[in-house]
Amino acid sequence: MIADIKKDAQERMGKCVDATKNQMAKVRTGRAHPSLLDSIQVSYYGTMTPLNQVANVGVEDARTLSVTVFDRSAIQAVEKAIMSSDLGLNPMSAGATLRIPLPALTEERRKDFIKVVRAEAEGGRVAIRNVRRDAISDVKKLEKAKECTEDDVRRFEDEVQKFTDAHIKKVDEILAAKEIELMEV
């Protein structure tokens, strides 16, 4: 029973780390990467559709993304969706392909992004600690039901604390790498 709780807690903490990493990937750095446009929804024949379902997003060079639209009639809708996103991008049309030059980030904008990334990291840490708290409370319920001993609970708390620390360290490493990436000029 305790092993199941421990395994579940580790999986949930891993998911928290992955979710934090995915949230940080959405924060724009000076470099072009296709996941930058993942959150964009396009009005395609009256339905809001993810951009990656109506176009292929690729990297042309370090500061340029290329979006190849599958259906030529959707080029205007894709262009409008990219312009209306809060990313501050300005696509240029070239046939069935849109080229999106990424403007250089100002120092002030970089610092704003670092604040956002730090907030995401803190959210990830809090989620990991919540998983730890839930796991420990589950084991204490088992102790009250006389299904495990007090020593088992103490041992479990120590183990959970160790992998909580390990997962928080992963989040901190992801944060440090993202901060370095953001401050590159």
From Swiss-Prot:
Cell compartment(s), UniProt: Cytoplasm
Family: Belongs to the RRF family.
Keywords, ordered alphabetically: Cytoplasm, Protein biosynthesis
NCBIfam families: frr
This protein's GO CC annotations: cytoplasm; cytosol
Gene3D superfamilies: 3.30.1360.40, Ribosome-recycling factor (1.10.132.20)
Annotated function: Responsible for the release of ribosomes from messenger RNA at the termination of protein biosynthesis. May increase the efficiency of translation by recycling ribosomes from one round of translation to another.
UniProt-listed Pfam families: RRF
Record-level Gene Ontology MF annotations: ribosomal large subunit binding
GO BP: cytoplasmic translational termination; translation
UniProt superkingdom: Bacteria
Name of the protein in question: Ribosome-recycling factor
Organism of derivation: Shewanella oneidensis (strain ATCC 700550 / JCM 31522 / CIP 106686 / LMG 19005 / NCIMB 14063 / MR-1)
